[in-house]
Amino acid sequence: MANYEFSQVSGDRPGCRLSRKAQIGLGVGLLVLIALVVGIVVILLRPRSLLVWTGEPTTKHFSDIFLGRCLIYTQILRPEMRDQNCQEILSTFKGAFVSKNPCNITREDYAPLVKLVTQTIPCNKTLFWSKSKHLAHQYTWIQGKMFTLEDTLLGYIADDLRWCGDPSTSDMNYVSCPHWSENCPNNPITVFWKVISQKFAEDACGVVQVMLNGSLREPFYKNSTFGSVEVFSLDPNKVHKLQAWVMHDIEGASSNACSSSSLNELKMIVQKRNMIFACVDNYRPARFLQCVKNPEHPSCRLNT
C-alpha cells in the first residue's frame, strides 16, 4: 500500500475573499445608496412652499373666531339651535378647502356643510340686499324678526372673515389667499357665499324683500350675488311676491327710483318667473334708521 501524507487542514472552510479594491467599491456604493435614501426622505419631509397670492390671508385666529361666533349664535342669539355641534361644523367647513388648490373649489365641496347645518327661516321674513349691507343689517337687528343671509348661522359665522387652504399643508393659509382679480373665481370664499346664498333663496317662502342702493347708477346689478344667484334661485311655488326697497343715501343724489330702467329689468325677471313685483322708494321704516344720523335732513321730517 502506498504511503500518503496528510497535511493538517484548518477548521475554517476556504472561501472567496473580496479584493481590497472590490471592498472599497462596495463600501462606496453602499454610502451612495444611503445618501440617496436620506436625500429622498429629506425632500419628502421638507415643507413645500405655499402658493403665493395677492389677496389677504386667512383671518388670524380663524378657528377661535369661528367657534366663538357659532357658540354665541346657538347658545345666546338663537337658543332654539343650541343642539348644533360647533366643532363638527368647523371640521366640515374646513374639509371643503383645506389641502386643496384654492382656485379649484367646487360647490360640491361645501355640500356636506349645507347638509349638516339646517335652519328654517319663517315665511315672509327673508330680506336680501345688494350694495346696502350696513343698512340692511341695521334694519333686521332693530326689527328683530327678519333675516338677511348674515342673520343665519353660517352667514353670521363667516361674515367678513377670510380663509383658504393650500395643497402643501393640512392647515389654513395664513400667508396669502387669492384675490378675486387673480383669475380665480372658484376660490373658497366666493364659492361658499354662492352656495349658501343659493340655499337661502331656495328656502325662502311667502313675500320676500330686497334692499337696493338707489344712489348707485344701477341699483339692480345683474352681476351681484342677488342679481346672478338669489333672484334666480327663488322658488315660484313658494314665493309669490318680491318687494324691492330702493334706499337712497340721505346726503346723496336720488338719481334712480322704482321707475328706473335698472328696476324695470328686475321687474321683468321676477314677472317672467311668475311672481308679483312691487317697489317702494325709500321704504319708511328703513329711512328712519338713516335719519338717526341725520335727524335734521328735510327727508327726515315727519310730513315729508
From Swiss-Prot:
Q: Which UniProt keywords apply?
A: Disulfide bond, Glycoprotein, Hydrolase, Membrane, NAD, NADP, Signal-anchor, Transferase, Transmembrane, Transmembrane helix
The membrane-spanning stretches of this chain are 22-44
- How is it placed in the membrane, per its record? Single-pass type II membrane protein
> Which pairs are disulfide-linked?
C70-C86, C103-C184, C164-C177, C258-C279, C291-C300
Ranges per topology, Cytoplasmic: 1-21
Keyword field contains S-adenosyl-L-methionine: no
Fetch the SUPFAM superfamilies from UniProt: N-(deoxy)ribosyltransferase-like
Q: Where is the active site?
A: C123, C205
Q: Which reaction does it catalyse?
A: NAD(+) = cyclic ADP-beta-D-ribose + nicotinamide + H(+); nicotinate + NADP(+) = nicotinate-adenine dinucleotide phosphate + nicotinamide; NAD(+) + H2O = ADP-D-ribose + nicotinamide + H(+)
Q: Which residue ranges are assigned to the Extracellular compartment in the record's topology?
A: 45-304
Molecular function GO labels: hydrolase activity, acting on glycosyl bonds; identical protein binding; NAD+ nucleosidase activity, cyclic ADP-ribose generating; phosphorus-oxygen lyase activity; transferase activity
What changes when the gene is disrupted? Answer: Loss of cADPR and NAADP synthesis.
Positions annotated as glycosylated: N104, N124, N213, N223
Where does the protein principally reside? membrane
Q: What is its EC number?
A: 3.2.2.-, 3.2.2.6, 2.4.99.20
- The signal peptide here is none
Cite a GO CC annotation: membrane
Asked if the Swiss-Prot or TrEMBL record annotates the protein with the keyword Nucleotide-binding, the reply is no
Q: Which GO terms describe its biological process?
A: B cell proliferation; B cell receptor signaling pathway; negative regulation of apoptotic process; negative regulation of DNA-templated transcription; positive regulation of B cell proliferation; positive regulation of DNA-templated transcription; response to xenobiotic stimulus
Location in the cell: Membrane
The record's note on quaternary structure and interaction partners says: Homodimer.
Describe the family membership recorded for this protein in Swiss-Prot or TrEMBL: Belongs to the ADP-ribosyl cyclase family.
Q: What does this protein do?
A: Synthesizes the second messengers cyclic ADP-ribose (cADPR) and nicotinate-adenine dinucleotide phosphate (NAADP), the former a second messenger for glucose-induced insulin secretion, the latter a Ca(2+) mobilizer. Also has cADPR hydrolase activity.
UniProt cross-references to PANTHER family, sorted A to Z = ADP-RIBOSYL CYCLASE, ADP-RIBOSYL CYCLASE_CYCLIC ADP-RIBOSE HYDROLASE 1
**Name of this chain's protein:** ADP-ribosyl cyclase/cyclic ADP-ribose hydrolase 1
